[in-house]
């Protein structure tokens, strides 16, 4: 059975699924699992949301964060899971395994950032979707993954990309080497202009302000971007605006500051869903209610 047939069969009925996926166009030695949810009313014309987990490698949880929105709006949710055994550490997951252990640049087809586009192409090949574009959401380490994906990959298949609370950012400059910047990995001015032109959505919890902890990147390049994730989000937008101004072009990014909310992948998922599919920001009282009694959700 081809993988297209496997997908079509698994997603023929509503509900949750966990579908093993070997990316033969990329690094076939590192399998993944696609955690999916299809509501009963979903059709091949329904929006597709690709969801990227954080450092806990919990794609099943991140899929579940999106189930209320999926049920409300008829969304197909697909959350690729990069497990710790096959994608150990930040270099192989957050940083896309762009660089080998000896710091040489790996083949571009094997970068982790190419996986979401190939997953979406398989969904189309399987007839699961007729949509030409997908939504992408990533939080925390998944937000690191997401903005680096937007920095390095063709963006034709993305309707929208939202990144929530990344720990630090790859700055939109060729003058700093990857992952601090985009230099040294075969990218050029065209890719940088493409990134600046894309309507990237940056979601930043106003209470994501811890200045130390095991999940907060603390290398000098990260600390230079600000003391905490909230400050680093604002620094990233400012860097994009400055690089665009230098070139006389627009920076089409948007930073949405989320009141009351800290490092919470569930609530930031709800905010992204509301902005995309309800076309509105949740009101202050709703956000305050969501914040009560919550800790971090990685």
Task: List the predicted regions and their residue ranges.
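A domain-start/cap signature at the N-terminus of enzymes
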Residues: 1-48, 58-61, 72, 104, ...
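Alpha/beta-hydrolase
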Residues: 50-52, 164, 258
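Glycine-rich nucleophile elbow surrounding the catalytic serine of serine-hydrolase chemistry
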Residues: 53, 138-148
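Histidine-bearing beta->alpha loop at or near hydrolase active sites
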Residues: 258-264
């Amino acid at each position: 059975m081809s993988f297209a047939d496997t997908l079509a069969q698994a997603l023929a009925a509503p509900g949750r699924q966990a579908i093993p996926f070997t990316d033969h166009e990329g690094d076939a030695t590192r399998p993944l699992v696609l955690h999916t949810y299809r509501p009963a009313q979903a059709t091949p014309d329904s929006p597709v949301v690709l969801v990227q987990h954080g450092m806990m490698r919990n794609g099943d949880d991140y899929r579940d964060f999106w189930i209320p929105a999926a049920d409300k709006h008829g969304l197909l949710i697909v959350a690729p899971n990069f497990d710790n055994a096959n994608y150990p550490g930040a270099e192989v997951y957050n940083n896309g395994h762009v660089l080998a252990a000896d710091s040489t640049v790996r083949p571009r087809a094997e970068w982790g950032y190419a996986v979401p586009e190939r997953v979406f192409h398989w969904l189309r090949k399987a007839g699961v979707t007729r949509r030409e574009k997908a939504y992408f959401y990533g939080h925390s380490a998944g937000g690191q993954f997401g903005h680096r994906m937007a920095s390095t990959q063709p963006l034709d298949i993305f309707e929208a990309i939202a990144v929530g609370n990344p720990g630090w950012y790859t700055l939109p400059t060729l003058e700093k080497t990857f992952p601090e910047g985009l230099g040294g990995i075969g990218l050029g001015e065209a890719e940088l202009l493409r990134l600046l032109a894309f309507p990237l959505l940056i979601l930043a919890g106003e209470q994501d302000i811890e200045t130390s902890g095991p999940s907060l990147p603390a290398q000098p390049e990260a600390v230079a971007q600000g003391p905490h994730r909230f400050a680093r989000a604002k620094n990233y937008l400012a860097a994009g605006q400055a690089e665009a101004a230098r070139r006389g072009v627009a920076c089409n990014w948007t930073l949405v500051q989320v009141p009351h909310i800290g490092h919470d992948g569930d609530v930031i998922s709800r905010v992204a869903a509301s902005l995309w599919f309800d076309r509105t920001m949740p009101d202050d009282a709703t956000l305050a209610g969501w914040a009560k009694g919550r800790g971090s959700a990685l």
